[in-house]
């Protein structure tokens, strides 16, 4: 099989409609012998800002010395852009090998009336590739909602909901509260809080469903205060962060160097 044939096969899966649930993605993961069991996953959901948040997170983790997988959507030019390891896109050969491996199984599923969607299959392509590359951490951008998204086939060690707004109401719900509740399902197990920039009714719904929540915002009511001072020059931007228990002005909190370096690198790449 050639690369262009593999990609054409994947794109052809777009004809299948999205069905809420992770059962199909879980079945494909099982068929692939459950890749990703040893990977620590970070799941990024939200109505806006998912992609940039995922990339910021990946940048900080890489600066901290981890090998990091990044899964985002959509792509601009090639499918390979969606799946990266340490800043390098997945290879053509890996995509072709994956499609050769799963194509017969996917055809049988479709013939039985249980087809998988493009997003479900590409999500598992990412997880499979991250496993083969032996990454330490993988950052997954949620496609739609959270509870029934293919990325929820894994159990994250950390997750966030950037914002919540009315979107995809036919699938996620008719109100902000319903949509927030669906997104809250990405919350990690245990005592790790769900991180969010949501406010108002959305924040209340997230707290009600996810339990402990760490809020991020631009005012003093947030647990983590972020100030963005705009573009300082044509190549730089300035960001200040204040964490609980410290003040950015008096240096009450000491941040790991990788945190600042990762934010700086990601901001420069975006400009």
Which role does the model predict for each range below?
Residues 22-37, 63-154, 170-173, 178:
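ATP-dependent carboxylate-amine ligase catalytic core
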Residues 57, 126, 206:
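Aromatic/hydrophobic pocket-lining residues that form π-stacking "cages" and hydrophobic walls in ligand
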Residues 137, 158, 193:
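Short, Asp-centered acidic motifs that coordinate Mg2+ and/or phosphate
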Residues 152-163:
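Inter-motif core of Ras-like GTPase G domains
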